[in-house]
């Protein structure tokens, strides 16, 4: 659902009012519902209770295995039931506003989701990173972010709202559409994807937002993504990255059970307070304690610690020594991330020689410490560069949106 803004405010007031009312009365999506929620929704829509289990099984297969986005394509469901489902529910994909392809094959999509309640349409970014033998989709959990990490582009955008489980899963489903990763779908000509098997083999909750500040919706989405009768992604291939929301780290291990990544970036509280301000609430001692107690932690299920390399800020050998000491005894991998510049930042990337010295010290201490190859820099798709276009709407679009909401509330 989208709006054309190439109209004057006076001429479009009635259209905008109708759109606002339609937004408030939008049909619920079946995507992102748990089986229990779907059962309740189907019964409320008139599906006989004795049929519900079978219908959920059919819908689950069509939505998550076959990847259909129109009830009409569900061929083993009667025409009458398909019509009833279409009357009460939607399974539509978000609007793909823009798709950018980097020189290295990385793809970035700008997705637009319809309003929620009295809100306005929102936009988020997702990134696909092809590698030898696998393809990773970086998914967003919020529109904007509250954490204000000083080196992160997304952190400069205010939080608009949390994404729903539907919107989180829609990023995966739409990316699979675009890559031809569903049966009977074609891969775009020239697309860089794994030669065999799935195009999307891994997902990482490392896009816009702090996933653990949207715990319930993220949990619901990831449990569906790992469902053996649905997308069927192994929990070993799903990584949730957090800046350190300590109480929910424990819940993540107990209730979701996916791989954990920590946006660390500093080994001294006084510096991390600046780089990652949530450290003031959950300092390093509390964060590391939660990591040591993460359920299932082992050499086969290591925690990934992300460490952005900032010139003359956190890249000294003393920092490397403190890092090794801090993580002692934790099965871990340390991703060293060359800082990815973005417009307006005051930080610089560490010199490559210094990054290698840092990596050599950490590696010699027994920790895998790969230097992450920057991907998608030319399309602002690299780590720390994501930022939706929602804050960059043209003035005319903002005015039209405001008029739409005013008109809707004035009826």
Curated annotation (Swiss-Prot):
Catalytic activity: adenosine(2503) in 23S rRNA + 2 reduced [2Fe-2S]-[ferredoxin] + 2 S-adenosyl-L-methionine = 2-methyladenosine(2503) in 23S rRNA + 5'-deoxyadenosine + L-methionine + 2 oxidized [2Fe-2S]-[ferredoxin] + S-adenosyl-L-homocysteine; adenosine(37) in tRNA + 2 reduced [2Fe-2S]-[ferredoxin] + 2 S-adenosyl-L-methionine = 2-methyladenosine(37) in tRNA + 5'-deoxyadenosine + L-methionine + 2 oxidized [2Fe-2S]-[ferredoxin] + S-adenosyl-L-homocysteine
Positions of S-adenosyl-L-methionine binding: 209-210, 241, 263-265, 340
Cofactor: [4Fe-4S] cluster
Binding site for [4Fe-4S] cluster: 145, 149, 152
SUPFAM superfamilies per UniProt: Radical SAM enzymes
Residue ranges of domain Radical SAM core in the record: 131-380
Cofactor detail note: Binds 1 [4Fe-4S] cluster. The cluster is coordinated with 3 cysteines and an exchangeable S-adenosyl-L-methionine.
InterPro entries in the record: Aldolase_TIM, Methyltransferase_A, RlmN_N, RNA_MTrfase_RlmN, rRNA_lsu_MTrfase_RlmN/Cfr, rSAM
Gene Ontology biological process terms in this record: rRNA base methylation; tRNA methylation
S-S pairs: 138-383
Gene Ontology molecular functions: 4 iron, 4 sulfur cluster binding; metal ion binding; rRNA (adenine(2503)-C2-)-methyltransferase activity; rRNA binding; tRNA (adenine(37)-C2)-methyltransferase activity; tRNA binding
Active site: 125 (proton acceptor), 383 (s-methylcysteine intermediate)
PANTHER family given in the database record: 23S RRNA METHYLTRANSFERASE, RADICAL SAM CORE DOMAIN-CONTAINING PROTEIN
Protein name: Dual-specificity RNA methyltransferase RlmN
């Amino acid at each position: 659902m989208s709006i054309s803004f190439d109209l004057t405010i006076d001429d479009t007031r009635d259209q905008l009012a109708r759109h606002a009312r339609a937004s408030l009365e939008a049909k619920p999506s079946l995507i992102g519902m748990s089986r229990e929620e779907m059962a309740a929704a189907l019964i409320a829509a008139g599906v006989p209770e004795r049929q519900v289990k079978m219908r959920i099984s059919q819908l689950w297969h069509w939505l998550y295995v076959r990847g259909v986005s129109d009830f009409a394509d569900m061929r083993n469901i009667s025409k009458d039931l398909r019509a009833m489902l279409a009357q009460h529910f939607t399974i539509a994909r978000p609007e793909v506003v823009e798709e950018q392809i980097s020189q290295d094959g990385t793809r970035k999509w700008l997705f637009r989701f319809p309003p929620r309640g009295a809100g306005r349409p929102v936009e988020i970014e997702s990134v696909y990173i092809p590698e030898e033998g696998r393809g990773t989709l970086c998914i967003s959990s919020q529109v904007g972010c509250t954490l204000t990490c000083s080196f992160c582009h997304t952190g400069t955008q205010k939080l608009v709202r949390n994404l729903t489980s539907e919107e989180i899963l829609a990023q995966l489903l739409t990316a699979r559409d675009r890559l031809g990763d569903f049966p009977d779908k074609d891969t775009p000509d020239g697309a860089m994807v794994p030669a065999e098997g799935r195009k999307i083999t891994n997902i990482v909750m490392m896009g816009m937002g702090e996933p653990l500040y949207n715990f319930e919706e993220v949990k619901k989405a990831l449990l569906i993504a790992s469902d053996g009768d649905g997308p069927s992604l192994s929990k070993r291939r799903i990584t949730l990255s957090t800046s350190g929301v300590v109480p929910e780290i424990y819940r993540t291990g107990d209730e979701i059970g996916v791989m954990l990544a920590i946006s660390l970036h500093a080994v001294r509280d006084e510096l991390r307070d600046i780089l990652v301000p949530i450290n003031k609430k959950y300092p390093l001692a509390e964060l590391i304690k939660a990591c040591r107690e993460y359920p299932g932690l082992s050499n086969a299920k290591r925690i990934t610690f992300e460490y952005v390399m900032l010139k003359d800020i956190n890249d000294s050998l003393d920092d490397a020594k403190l890092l090794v000491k801090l993580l002692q005894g934790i099965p871990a991998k340390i991703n060293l991330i060359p800082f990815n510049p973005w417009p307006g930042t005051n930080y610089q990337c560490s010199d490559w020689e210094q990054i290698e010295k840092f990596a050599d010290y950490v590696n010699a201490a027994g920790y895998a410490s790969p230097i992450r190859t920057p991907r998608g820099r030319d399309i602002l798709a690299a780590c720390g560069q994501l930022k939706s276009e929602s804050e960059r709407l043209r003035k005319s679009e903002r005015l039209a949106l405001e008029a739409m909401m005013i008109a809707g509330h004035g009826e």
